């Protein structure tokens, strides 16, 4: 009829995409080798804990003090933490992230956590050294050079102090957080950290709700951040722990 003529001939049925079986994917040697490298970590089940509402720095744009968590009642009882970690372990938690506000201020609680669940990491500003007996990975936040740290984090010579505290410590990974203002400082900071044989990874500042300060990224700064990340990976391949897939 006339309507059918206007529509034209019906398109041929397109074949359905093939549904691959996992075993078929693993039959490819390269895929199988990559699978075997990562499957050993499948037992990890992570949970994050804020250790204290105290901090020895006051950083612009801090996620902890921009939100309601700062008003939570602090529990500094080691036995209470021991019981909590045992309950967490019984429900399958195998990896802990110890954060907020500054966990290095409660060293006795870090000891307790490590004694119950020995896999994990601590997010710290690096101002105080954490006892080597606590064998967690240590993630040390870096927001720029010492001048920027003085302005943004109200701390003098913070990068120098961080390096002094953790130089040669195999637990330590310095986390350079890119903000809109510190992108061009990354080269200077990376050179200092690499010269001290410190390992580094990258982070991108994520503004807390309601924050409109100068650290907040825009589209242009995010593009430049990616460029600098790739430059630093190329310049310091032995010291940067990062993947181009994440840049």
Residue ranges and their predicted role:
Residues 1-5, 90, 136, 141-247:
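Radical SAM enzyme [4Fe-4S]-AdoMet core and its adjacent flexible, acidic
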Residues 5-132:
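Conserved alpha-helical substructure of the radical SAM core
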């Amino acid at each position: 009829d006339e309507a059918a003529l206007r529509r034209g001939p019906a398109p041929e049925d397109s074949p359905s995409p093939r549904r691959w079986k996992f075993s078929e994917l693993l039959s490819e040697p390269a895929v199988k080798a990559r699978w075997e490298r990562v499957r050993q970590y499948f037992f990890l089940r992570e949970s994050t804990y804020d250790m204290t509402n105290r901090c020895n720095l006051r950083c612009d744009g801090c996620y902890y003090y921009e939100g309601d968590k700062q008003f939570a009642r602090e529990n500094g009882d080691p036995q209470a933490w021991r019981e909590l970690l045992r309950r967490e372990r019984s429900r399958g938690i195998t990896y802990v992230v110890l954060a907020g506000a500054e966990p290095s201020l409660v060293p006795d609680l870090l000891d307790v956590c490590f004694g119950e669940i020995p896999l994990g990491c601590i997010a710290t500003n690096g101002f105080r050294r954490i006892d080597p007996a606590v064998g967690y990975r240590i993630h040390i936040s870096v927001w720029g050079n010492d001048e920027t740290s003085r302005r943004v984090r109200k701390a003098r010579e913070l990068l120098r102090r961080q390096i002094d505290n953790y130089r040669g410590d195999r637990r330590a990974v310095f986390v350079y957080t890119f903000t809109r203002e510190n992108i061009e400082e990354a080269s200077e900071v990376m050179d200092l950290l690499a010269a001290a044989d410190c390992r580094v990874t990258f982070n991108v500042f994520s503004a807390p709700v309601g924050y409109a300060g100068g650290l907040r990224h825009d589209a242009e700064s995010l593009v430049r951040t990616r460029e600098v990340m790739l430059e630093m990976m190329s310049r310091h391949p032995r010291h940067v722990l990062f993947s181009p897939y994440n840049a």
